[in-house]
Amino acid sequence: MSGIVEAISNAVKSGLDHDWVNMGTSIADVVAKGADFIAGFFS
């Protein structure tokens, strides 16, 4: 769960710094970590 929070934090910081490439990759990281977290309930 802490990985998701860290990824969201990175996305927000990148957005505030107008670093759009890092923001995009951070959002993708949030989605991937969220999918892994949800998949953990089904295994």
Curated annotation (Swiss-Prot):
Keywords: Cytolysis, Formylation, Hemolysis, Secreted, Toxin, Virulence. Pfam families: PSMbeta (PF05480). The modification N-formylmethionine is found at residue 1. The keyword Secreted applies. InterPro entries: PSMbeta (IPR008846). Its main location: secreted. GO terms for molecular function: toxin activity. GO terms for biological process: killing of cells of another organism. GO terms for cellular component: extracellular region. It is found in: Secreted. Belongs to the staphylococcal hemolytic protein family. Virulence factor. Causes hemolysis of erythrocytes from sheep (HD(50)=7.53 mM), rabbit (HD(50)=28.07 mM), guinea pig (HD(50)=4.23 mM), dog (HD(50)=4.37 mM) and human (HD(50)=3.32 mM). Acts synergistically with beta-hemolysins from S.aureus ATCC 25923. Cytotoxic towards human dermal fibroblasts. This is Hemolysin H1C.
